[in-house]
Amino acid sequence: MRTNRRGFTLIELLIVVVIIGILAAIAIPKFANTKEKAYLAAMKSDLRNLATTEETYASDKLGVYGDETQVGFTGSAGVVLVVTPNGGLGWSAVATHASTTKECVVYVGVPTAIPTLTNPPATVPPVREGEPTCDIL
């Protein structure tokens, strides 16, 4: 008497495991930089909001820019902003995040020094006036 066996053979199971491994090898690198991109987005957003706050402050103070404490700006969680005003001529700011080594910079007008990035993108000028620029991933 012959019994019908049910189930998968070892070869079938190995093929499934190999297919899952290939899919994982494709998907994991795509999502590996997701957190890093989120940190950079938070820093860029804070720099844009800081620029708006600086301009509002300067319009109230007859064109004189202030640092982050004077203008009353608080960044997102984990983001540290260092603003260097140059009186009524301009200002610059550097944003860092506690969870990444990357940084973002911005300047407006004539700052005391134009900020530089440690790893600037090659496709654009390292820093353009009024436009937050970040290190590349």
Task: Give residue spans per PLM region.
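Short, intrinsically disordered, low-complexity terminal segments
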Residues: 21, 35, 90-92
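Periplasmic/extracellular, small/polar-rich flexible segments of pilin-like filament-forming proteins
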Residues: 48, 52-137
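N-terminal single-pass transmembrane signal-anchor helix
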Residues: 2-31
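Aliphatic-rich helix starts adjacent to a transmembrane/signal segment
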Residues: 30-47
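Short, contiguous, well-ordered secondary-structure segments
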Residues: 1-2, 56
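Hydrophobic transmembrane-helix microenvironments that flank and shape a buried ionizable site
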Residues: 9, 43, 51-52
